[in-house]
Design a protein with these regions (language model features):
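Hydrophobic beta-strand residues in large extracellular and virion-surface proteins
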Residues: 3-5, 25, 33, 37, ...
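Short aromatic-glycine-(Arg/Gly/Cys) micro-motifs in beta-strand/loop hairpins
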Residues: 1-20
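Short, mixed-charge low-complexity intrinsically disordered segments
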Residues: 39-101
Length: 101
């Protein structure tokens, strides 16, 4: 299976055409590529100039939640940016498309 990772500029359900392809991973199932997708999210956030000098993290892919309106993605992920001097962390939505090779 092929897994395409997209970063959302805001809410995962909105502005679908503005989502950016971040990575493509190949594996037997989502569990096989989960670590690579987590690394891709962390690297993507770390490379963004506005998040320079910030720590980053990512949650493992999960099936799209029922409240989501987007039908393009089969899985969703959350990237987290930990600014050094801020009251709140920054959360970034990612979507994952699963397709046959």
């Amino acid at each position: 299976m092929k897994y395409k990772l997209f970063r959302s500029p805001g809410n995962l359900d909105k502005a679908i055409r503005k989502h950016e392809l971040v990575a493509v991973e190949i594996g037997k199932n989502i569990d096989d590529v989960a670590d690579a997708l987590i690394r891709a999210v962390r690297d993507d956030l770390a490379e963004m100039p506005e998040y320079a000098h910030c720590e980053t993290a990512a949650y493992a892919p999960e099936p799209i939640q029922e409240h989501r309106r987007v039908i393009r993605y089969q899985y969703e992920m959350m990237g987290v940016v930990y600014p050094q001097y801020a009251e709140k962390n920054i959360l970034i939505d990612y979507g994952v498309i699963e397709e046959a090779e």
